[in-house]
Structure formats: structure tokens, C-alpha cells
Regions:
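Short acidic/glycine-enriched loop/turn segments that link adjacent beta-strands
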Residues: 96-100
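Conserved S-adenosyl-L-methionine
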Residues: 7-9, 91-92
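Glyoxalase I/VOC metalloenzyme domain signal
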Residues: 1-7, 22-85, 105-146
């Protein structure tokens, strides 16, 4: 398939997580890999706080839950989606204050949730590292801890 290597985080920390405006402490395991310019995320929420991940599973679905758009102009994209009528359902930060992300309620319009992800700071460095590791990957060490 040309996907790999996978980078695994046992306890991904999502700071300032909010679901429908209410703060919660979400716990997750995450694996990331690239196939060319496309990053694939495998996310397993390990507690039962409310989130769009829980909403998706509780509705009886599984599989492809969201598509992410990376941006270096997070505030403008956030405002653009709100101006288009999409509501933020959950949001938080990963990798510090420049690692903001938000999931918008877009399932009625496009069939899946839209995530915007700020591509800056340590998160950008990690995403670049994962992409670079995928270029010419020979299949060795398919699972690596981040």
C-alpha cells in the first residue's frame, strides 16, 4: 500500500479540549503515517468523555470519520467555516499553543466532519518528520513510538 512507517503515541495529550464549549479531559491513542502527501490518522479514544469520536461510534458507524485541512492561517480558516454556517463541535490543542485543532459539524453537508489543524510549531515539525520518514520507506520498523 505504500503507507508507513506508523508513529504511535500511547497517551496523546490534547490540551484545552472542549466539546460543545464545555471543557473535558479526553484520553486517546493515536497512530500517524503518510502515503505521499496524505497523512492517515488512527485515533482510539480511551475514555468516555463526550467528543465527535464518541458521537460517531455511538451512531453505529465506524471507519472514515473526518477529513483534516492543515493551515498556517488557523484563525482565518476557523472564521471562514463559521461564516459558512458550520458549528465547532470539539476543539483543543496538541503540541502546544500553535497546535490548535477544531472539528466542525459538516456531516449534513459533506458526509463527514471537517477538521482544521494549525500547521505550526512542534506539530508542524512532527508532521514533517513523519512525512520525511515515509519517503522511500523500505518496510523496516513499521511501528515506531513518537
Amino acid at each position: 500500500m505504500g503507507v508507513g512507517p506508523w508513529f504511535y503515541v500511547e497517551n496523546a495529550i490534547l490540551d484545552n479540549f472542549k466539546y460543545k464549549g464545555q471543557p473535558h479531559n479526553i484520553e486517546m491513542k493515536v497512530a500517524l503515517a503518510n502515503s505521499g502527501d496524505v497523512q492517515i490518522e488512527l485515533i482510539q479514544q480511551t475514555n468516555d468523555v463526550p467528543s465527535m469520536y464518541q458521537d460517531f461510534l455511538n451512531s453505529g458507524r465506524e471507519g472514515f470519520q473526518h477529513i483534516a485541512y492543515w493551515t498556517e492561517d488557523y484563525d482565518a480558516m476557523y472564521q471562514h467555516l463559521q461564516d459558512k454556517g458550520y458549528d465547532v463541535v470539539h476543539e483543543g490543542q496538541i503540541g502546544g499553543p500553535q497546535g490548535r485543532m477544531a472539528y466542525f459539524d459538516s456531516e449534513h453537508a459533506v458526509g463527514i466532519a471537517i477538521e482544521i489543524s494549525e500547521l505550526a510549531g512542534s506539530k508542524k515539525q512532527i508532521f514533517d518528520y513523519i512525512k520525511k520518514a515515509s519517503i522511500g520507506w523500505n518496510g523496516s520498523k513499521p511501528i515506531r513510538k513518537l
